[in-house]
Amino acid sequence: MNNSKIISKVLLSLSLFTVGASAFVIQDELMQKNHAKAEVSAEEIKKHEEKWNKYYGVNAFNLPKELFSKVDEKDRQKYPYNTIGNVFVKGQTSATGVLIGKNTVLTNRHIAKFANGDPSKVSFRPSINTDDNGNTETPYGEYEVKEILQEPFGAGVDLALIRLKPDQNGVSLGDKISPAKIGTSNDLKDGDKLELIGYPFDHKVNQMHRSEIELTTLSRGLRYYGFTVPGNSGSGIFNSNGELVGIHSSKVSHLDREHQINYGVGIGNYVKRIINEKNE
């Protein structure tokens, strides 16, 4: 058998493996490589570039406010923004999480992994804000973590649950603010516009921002256009009814290696069932 046939068989095997793997393992390098397609029509690339330029074509500070803007102090005290907080893993990373229960925060598995199973390394700071002068405000305090459920949805799903301790007065965070209302991603369709809320660390430290995102496909989870940077991992995705329908995960190759797209985990029936079972 010549080398070209051997290579073809190997590539076919890899493709079959990737198709059979979980749709949500978006951090996996092999999956990212397989998003890079060898043949993409000029029309597809043009459409993608137009969307990409709309959301990323200018400096973030110059994006229209309806596409990307800081959440002001007044709104940070309102739903759903007050359910959003900074997930801080000491000495490792800073990301985002969403309060979904009295003591439960939903974030990404790849963020929770940084703690190596040690809850003492993690804290949750809802509605934290650091102004441009470096002054930091934590209106609901800083919550220590009691338990990390790193893979409650399975190893292939980029979601994790963090269970919080009550504050020093014995008050749970969910007694101070209403947790996010859990919706479903089942009713979403291509072209829908949603709101992504989180803490884009690479843009501004400890400043909550909202982004308008536009779904481009529901294949292999949620894919969408919208301004995101590191720190947005774990950001909540909300529909127009204020229901949590997904969690932002990452940005990976899309049409080819030069074109990226945002990926998120939708809250479908399976995810919603596990949330209901594990929520506290």
Curated annotation (Swiss-Prot):
Changing S233G: Loss of toxicity. Gene3D superfamilies: Trypsin-like serine proteases (2.40.10.10). Its cofactor is Ca(2+). Its EC number is 3.4.21.-. Pfam families: Trypsin_2. It is an enzyme of class 3 (hydrolase). GO terms for biological process: proteolysis; symbiont-mediated disruption of host cell-cell adhesion. This is Exfoliative toxin A. The gene is eta.
